[in-house]
Amino acid sequence: MSQQTTIRKLAELVNTPVEKLLEQLAGAGMKFSGPDQVVTSTEKMKLLGFLRRTHGKSDVSVGTVREAPKKITLNRRRLQEVTVNAGRNKTTVNVEVRQKRTYVKPPESEYHTPTKPPIELADAERVEILRKLEESRQRNLAEQQRLAEVDRQRVEEQERKRREEEQAELERQKTESRVVEEILVKTDSNSVKPVSKPISEERTRALPRTVRPTPAARPSVSRSDDRNSNGGVRHKARGSHVIVSDEDDSARRFAGQMHLTAAERARRGSNTRGKGGGSHRSATHRGNENSIRSSGAHGFERPTVAVVREVAVGDTITVADLAQKLALKSGDMVKALFKMGVMVTITQTIDHDTAVLVSEELGHKVTRASSSDFEDALLAHTEELHGEPVPRPPVVTIMGHVDHGKTSLLDYIRRTKIAVGEAGGITQHIGAYHVETPRGVISFLDTPGHAAFTSMRARGAKITDIVVLVVAADDGVMPQTKEAVQHARAAGVPLIVAVSKIDKSTADPQRVKNELLTESVVAEEFGGDTQFVELSAKTGVGVDALLDAISIQAEVLELKAVIEGRATGTVIESSLDKGRGPVATVLVQQGRLKKGDYLVCGTHYGRVRALFDEVGHQPLAASPSIPVQVLGLSGVPDAGDDFVVVDDERLAKDVAQQREAKRRESRLVTSAGNRMEDILAQMGKGENQQVLNLLIKADVQGSLEALKQALVALSNDDIRINVIHVGVGGITESDANSAVTSKATVIGFNVRADASARKIIEVNGVDLRYFSIIYDVIDQVKQVASGLLGVEIREEIIGVAEVRDVFRSSKFGAVAGCMIIEGVVKRSKPIRVLRDNTVVFEGELESLRRFKENVDEVRNSIECGIGVKAYNDVRVGDSIECFERIEVARTL
């Protein structure tokens, strides 16, 4: 670029506006007044340095050589094909592999010495490189020598082992040959003469290497020089010349080759036939045989005797399970039972005696299995609980009739509002809570009061220490009140009566005391031993007196429990949570339940993953009389099941599986009996009884049990409620398919169907109904069942006429002159002719006249003439009934 370059020309060269170039020059510290001024080379370099510094680059003069980059990034892409198994087919997928490597050049100060000349530096580098190459070559040579020595030692070791194996094999063959020779000599001593010349060692080696006696008894052989009449051939064996038949020869050959597979035996037989016999086999074939024998490959061995199995059978067992234990097909087992005169299917159960008989018939042995092995071990675990009993909190169950204020009373004690959250304002689950009061800790169980929850109330009374019977002062004693008294009396639990709702104007506590006298519940003021407390859950009056009464009763009972050791208790309620899995609400009765314990709960087991109390906190452990929620079980246990903590998971699993097997056997026996009862019932009732299939899913186990019992109780002679499946949790796809197959109505109690289940239900038109109150479930099922019953035809008498005289007509025959004594007689309705209150004819009117005029009806106390169609035997004194048929909807 010349020295006469102006700012305008420089702007054109660098493709930059003149104003921007002037700003950049000013930023570099050079002042120019206009675009026509000349820019020198020094000023250009100064501007370039400024721009480099501005953009993060070093200030390097234009004339210097550009430095090599200090960091280089290399990208590489490779395409590969990967074969992926997709079921039975294989799919090839293209995979692109991307690699990125970055190389950083270290500063020159690390490997350059500035004081040395460039030529000396290059020589030193070359010498260093040569030295490193020589060291690498020496290392590689030493490694190759070491590997060669290792290979040589390995080959020598293999050769030594091979020689030892050959020597051992040779010794074994010599021993076998000597033993077989002695056996043959002993067996054939009566019919075979030994040759005077002993067999040579070479002859012995030429014999087959493996000779084994046949399983069956060896037939006697006779000596002969020529082929005998049975087609035998001459064989030389162990120094004896014997004549062996073709059958014996094949059997002996098979006995010598039983250790081989079928393919090897066929190949060896073809080699033997092609070369004229086993004594002329080549050395190569013998070597192959040695290699096959030494490889350890074991072929099928034909059993020499029948296999007798000894199995353990409990009190009952299904036909399929017994066949599996005896390694038989289920069809063969059923066939054997049919031959014994027992008509069963593979799913039916048979008792122990029948299992013994059929097993002995098939050649096997049966012993009685102890069905309580693991239960005994579990009992030993529970009996090992030692410790000093200490006082424990009382467990109090609140019972009473529905809507008498049980949950409201508990809400006031706990300072909560549970009753507001209950559907319909009624309790439908067992609620378990523990409350810290000034008088100590008290555990409360709130039970439902509806009639359908009888089993739930009985379960609450079973595990409680004190029953608080809540009776509304304005309502008095009701059916569930009496039932609660019976539950408490059956469980032997003391009773405290809480007369609630005394704040109402219609309250009459004295009436409650008098009505309970009929149930043998006598108040203390009447000379009895039952405490009566009048209270109001709305105002709180009398609640403290109730807590005092509970504390006094607990002191009298002297409740104690061992708080250390393995925990035992009872399942109060259980459910299936979508996010947490099976959840069981348990009440600890002995010991301490901790996180991480293994426990058996009915037919389920598991490890405690977490503990939750009623407010959602996670305690580390639960002491006696404290209810907690347990997570980690293998399934949803039944409410009322006992739980026990064990040492290891193996015992827990064994006990749970044994209990499940017992329950399964019991269920099969029960179902078989029910099937027979159903068949007999159908035979007796004919086909008039309708069947309503139901599939019930509920949120908790207790509600599910109550629903099933309440709905099955609706069955009668006209309709049968058949519950095909019950379960805890949401309605799934399998539930929907079951409902489609059995044409059942699906009932969801506080649960909903998932997306896949809803799709199946909509496509197939399944009747799905959601409920949250048990009253509504029972009412809706009654309506559906009534719809299945159809209508009933009833006959209603609308009029009665008395025959006063009989006239003869050429057109109608006998015409009865009648007086209507009751109701109305209509021409369009059917009639009956009664004589001495006995029906003698049933038909219809042919003519109804009054004063020779046809009329449609004749009312009470009016005379008329009646012509009966196709009946001429009407007599004076007969009665003619006129009736109509009406349809009436049938209900449960």
From Swiss-Prot:
Localisation per UniProt entry: Cytoplasm
Annotated keywords: Cytoplasm, GTP-binding, Initiation factor, Nucleotide-binding, Protein biosynthesis
Main localization category: cytoplasm
Gene3D superfamilies: P-loop containing nucleotide triphosphate hydrolases, Putative DNA-binding domain, N-terminal subdomain of bacterial translation initiation factor IF2, Translation factors, Translation initiation factor IF- 2, domain 3
Gene Ontology MF term list: GTP binding; GTPase activity; guanosine tetraphosphate binding; translation initiation factor activity
Region spans: Disordered: 138-250, 262-298
Pfam families referenced in this protein's UniProt entry, alphabetically: EF-G_D2, GTP_EFTU, GTP_EFTU_D2, IF-2, IF2_assoc, IF2_N
Biased composition (Low complexity): 207-219
Residue positions binding GTP: 400-407, 446-450, 500-503
Name of this chain's protein: Translation initiation factor IF-2
